[in-house]
Amino acid sequence: MATTIQNNFRIRRNFGKINKIAEIPNLIAIQKFSYDKFLQADVPPEKRDDTGLQGVFKSVFPIKDFNETSSLEFVSYHLEKPKYDVDECHQRGMTYSAPIKVVVRLVVWDKDEETGAQSIRDVKEQEVYFGEIPLMTENGTFIINGTERVVVSQLHRSPGAFFDHDKGKSHSSGKLLYNARIIPYRGSWIDFEFDHKDILYVRIDRRRKLPATVLLRALGATPDTAKKDPVEFHGSAEEILKYYYDTETIRIEGKGKYEKDLVPDLLKGQRATRDIRDPKSNEVIVKKNRKYTESAIKKLVAAKMKSLPVEPEEVYTKISAEDVVDETTGEVLLEVNEEVTEAKVEELRKRNINEFKVLFIDNLNILPALRDTLMQDKISTPEEAIMEIYRRLRPGDPPTPETATNLFVNLFFNAERYDLSKVGRLKLNYKFGIEEPLENTVLTKRDILEVVRFLIDLKNGKPNKDVDDIDHLGNRRVRAVGELLENQYRIGLVRMERAIKERMSLQEIETLMPHDLINAKPVTAVIKEFFGSSQLSQFMDQTNPLSEVTHKRRLSALGPGGLTRERAGFEVRDVHSTHYGRICPIETPEGPNIGLIASLSTYARVNEYGFVETPYRKVEKGRVTDEVTFYSALEEEKHIIAQANAPVDKKGNFTEAKVWCRKEGEYIYVRPDEVDLMDVSPNQLVSVAASLVPFLENDDANRALMGSNMQRQAVPLLRTQAPLVGTGIEAIVARDSGVTTVAKRDGVVQSVDASRIVVKADVPTSATDVANEVDIYNLIKYQRSNQNTCINQKPIVKPGERVKKGDVIADGPATEMGELALGQNVVVAFMPWQGYNFEDSILLSERLIKEDVFTSVHIEEFECVARDTKLGKEEITRDIPNVGEEALKDLDESGIIRIGAEVKPGDILVGKITPKGETQLSPEEKLLRAIFGEKAGDVRDSSLRVPPGVSGTVINAKVFSRKGVEKDERAKAIEEMEEAKLLKDQNDEIKIIQDSAFQKIRRLLLGKEVTARLVDDKGEQLLKKGDVLDDALLDTVPQRYWGEIAVAGDVQDLARKIIENFEEQKELVKLLFGEKIGRLKKGDELPPGVIKMVKVYVAIKRKLAVGDKMAGRHGNKGVVSRVLPEEDLPYLEDGTPVDIVLNPLGVPSRMNVGQILETHLGWAARNVGLRLQEMIEKEWGADPLRKKLKAAFAGTEGGPVGERLAALIEDVPEKELPKLVQKLRRGMHVATPVFDGAREDEMKALMEEGSATLQSILFDGRTGEPFDQDVTVGVMYMLKLHHLVDEKIHARSIGPYSLVTQQPLGGKAQFGGQRLGEMEVWAMEAYGAAYSLQEFLTVKSDDVVGRTRMYEAIVKGENTLESGLPESFNVLIKELQSLALDVELLETPEAQAAREAAERDLGGGPLGAPRGAVASGEKSSA
């Protein structure tokens, strides 16, 4: 234990009370799991599921030609090894991808003309190259053209059926119009909607609407999909009505006397039209005009009444449910859906027909909407219905029954054109309670009929039927990388399918092989486009480890098939009750994307259907168990869920009589035995970034949002420091982000230096096996991240230490001791100081700059490319025309700057010359040519120079040259260095394997007697017969002869076997490194036309400066306003000056009190460290130290975590105690988890341990007087954000001008000028600064002639300003002329002469042509 404490182990006192039941799942699992499921690379082809890539191939193949005489079938696919590894792709700007090979089979059929039977004529199988597919790196990113990208998961509307109403907005009456929509994963949408007259309409693909009954009738005409269909339905009016309405049978008892069957279910809520009496007792059961109540209906049933009398007027409004036919004549007396009239009933009575069926419509609970729709509908047969649908979808095409039926069947019942996906099928089954197999992903007749039934029930106001909430997470699902890519791949394959079909029919199929048919270009193009330019494939935010993790866990509602910013309303963006534990309610951007981009909560995961799930503990009979299960938003719906902090005793029983719970988004108090589930942990409802904020529960939500977002912008510092007040999740973020190096296997550290760690792993092997038991971890040194921050790893283990699998052995950027460390712990005071902290400004101590506390390293990459131009080849060289030796002093003979050179703006990094076109030479130039030879004239200097605002040290240079181009000295030197590094790794690996193998042989031979003499190659005796082998004797024999030593038994065979195995392993290692060295030596793949490319990396140290933005973790941000010398700052009683002075007014109105609590707790933690330090200095001895440590780390009430820490402190040997205390000299580390943090009494107790006070007396550093009031002083964790003043400051005198308007470009990147808008012009006018304004609007902007004159005037020493005509005036004239307005400029003769003279000087064209224009990007000096 002792060794771990002194090295890579951090003890934190945890204030959490709630036991950790479940571990936080791997933070980037959503990305890795999804992509693995898509590729299924490690699954043998025959065992692959039909999802991802396999699913796409299966759904598109087999491809048949148009006559179906041949088909191309898919057999299997496999991925080959990627050409370059991750590092090489980074350096060379390549894509990290693997070739994909597909085995396809071409089958040619013979068709018998008469019988139509098919027989196989020919089968050809072949493996075809199918392009490359990008692979995911270990950390869940993709490397595309050398940059790391992340594919963000998309949150979109799940496929299925959705019901809604228009909220009364469509019609002036404010009536609710209900609608339904069936959304497939791909295919046509169906919309059903009621209008204000209660007619039900349907739209297909948002075309013109038809009465819904047309679609229902058309279902009857679909050719037999009914084999799969669960309902018999032929689309007649009678069937439609009977499907949706109950029927009643009316009997004619005589003239004006009618009866109906008593159906108890239909009576409820109806009114009796006369007194209903019990036939036996004659007592009145239901009085006239009263409703049939449940008790009355029971009495009727008890009285065994079979029928009820019906009033004639009631009969005369009923609707017939079927055709009533006179059987003798075959005449239809009463048509289906016809209103029953007195005349019709009389007609029936005359014909002796005494009963008929009517629809049960009571206009209360059951409305005549569908019957009315059927009346509106003029179509009577399914065939006509299908023709009508065809006319709506393809207006202008004359339909035939065949084409119409084909179109209709393809729309919804053909798996190639319509796909609900498993999710859609699952949702339909769930919604309508049907049990269709999930594999059936097309619509069935029953689905459509049930959607209409549900919609009618909604309209009728049936209980338990409600409209859907579109923002419920049961109706939104996540499409992760795998699925997004699967959709893209399908698009590519479908494009390819068209081409294949055409080729199959055009060419002679017998002579073709599968590879002649397949061209993989469309597929690779689609994949390339997706990774390169899709809205969801984003440039990874690599500022610090937290921003990487958050980016990979992000959910976006934008993107293809999602919402757009403009259209998204308020509801979509809002927090929904189902977000609890699934999507973080805090972390979302401010601005137009608020609520559309969210982050997964800490414990959330995405299930196979794409729904977000969160874990809960099972509760049985009021006792909480440790069984954890994941629930999606729909599954959770009916459960009663207790909070994680509900008080529970040791056995898991709730201690209180009522428990505060959630049910369906509401909060309620319930008895313990009613609770079903309980939260796993209090921080399960927030995201990773939010759970890094201590005392989050004491911050206002808006500020918590800013705090979460700003942590992602923290720049990794040169000297990292984990927070004194953390939340206990820091180590998890550091481990899962992939920036630290984590041990792959248990083992012992063999050697450590700054750039690599060698671990000898524990590999259990048999006596003779030799395994590769070496893990070499090459650390990343000073690499540039996407955001120009510095990625650098440093080891935190020592040789001889034991490491376990999963231990952090090297820290990365912004981590310390395996914990996330985004900022620094500094002593802050909340007080005003001379107005320098007005409006959130921050006052700093010079110490922070002197000691590099907030210094960060940024790495800029500069690229120089030598191309083959029309005029000749560009050359990278040291020999540059017109450049003095001083400027070349740091370039080597190849023209590339040396590593370690300090550079400033304007310095040459890479010397390059470009051939110049031959121009007419002036006499002076001819003279120069004659004197100095050819060289100077025909080339110009196009060297790569350091841009303004960058000064630093060159840390690396890389040279890439085309195959077949002679490598220069620098390239050779770099190559040799790389090769030496690889060889060193290879030799170390072999050496460790060798040591371990011969250690085994040594164990076998020790103590054995030699049975035969051993001689070496020269015949000299090494061992004589009878020698007994011991260590000393063995060491005299060279290892290569150990296999030759003859001893009794089979030891010699075993020794030889070990040596053989060792040789085999050695060859494997050499082979692996040989491949890498081979790749180093061969030329690089460069873009066309490029001969050579040089990349130079410059490291810039940025110290904290006035104007930099800083922030705490609670949304308390500010800008540095002044840096004060230490002696002027307020200081404490012991003389310590504070580091930062913050404005106390920043706290009350913003309500982020968490920062004050953090300050207090940090102060207590720091003081405990100081007290311990004092105890060591005064040599108190081990026992009091131990006691103090226990009191500080384990607290008074202990708890399981406290007990563990107390035991740990007890185990530390006496002489190690000072080392442990030394580690706490800056303060002890504490963790206060979100929503389960330190309580006030605990904080006070810790304060007392460190004898600290909540407020301190401060003294003014300038006068030495104490301030009037006590000041809150403490330790706060402050971050330096990525908005650095050095990167934003920018100045220009002359630079590039825009081509058309001749005005300076804008922005720092283009080296542009400052915009002078109309408001600035008003300001100048207000001051009457006419001459300055004239200058601004002419020569400083776009007056080309004036610019030249100005230059001349300055040269001649005159100071007059003659402005010319601004170029934008010419642009305006041209604009007006393009609108066919004849506008011309009238000039006085003098002005014209002056203009023409200027044009001659400039060599410009006529008026309006861009004169002396410079393409944007090229600098023009006036």
From Swiss-Prot:
Q: Which Pfam families does UniProt cross-reference here? A: RNA_pol_Rpb2_1, RNA_pol_Rpb2_2, RNA_pol_Rpb2_3, RNA_pol_Rpb2_45, RNA_pol_Rpb2_6, RNA_pol_Rpb2_7
PROSITE patterns on file: RNA_POL_BETA
Region Disordered, annotated ranges: 1392-1422
Its catalytic activity?
A: RNA(n) + a ribonucleoside 5'-triphosphate = RNA(n+1) + diphosphate
Q: Which InterPro entries match?
A: DNA-dir_RNA_pol_bsu_ext_1_sf, DNA-dir_RNA_pol_bsu_external_1, DNA-dir_RNA_pol_su2, DNA-dir_RNAP_su2_dom, DNA-dir_RNAP_su2_hyb_sf, RNA_pol_bsu_bac, RNA_pol_bsu_CS, RNA_pol_bsu_protrusion
Q: Does the keyword Transcription apply?
A: yes
Q: The organism sits in which domain of life?
A: Bacteria
What's the stated role of this polypeptide? DNA-dependent RNA polymerase catalyzes the transcription of DNA into RNA using the four ribonucleoside triphosphates as substrates.
Question: What is known about its subunit structure?
Answer: The RNAP catalytic core consists of 2 alpha, 1 beta, 1 beta' and 1 omega subunit. When a sigma factor is associated with the core the holoenzyme is formed, which can initiate transcription.
Q: What name does this protein carry?
A: DNA-directed RNA polymerase subunit beta
Record the organism: Anaeromyxobacter sp. (strain K)
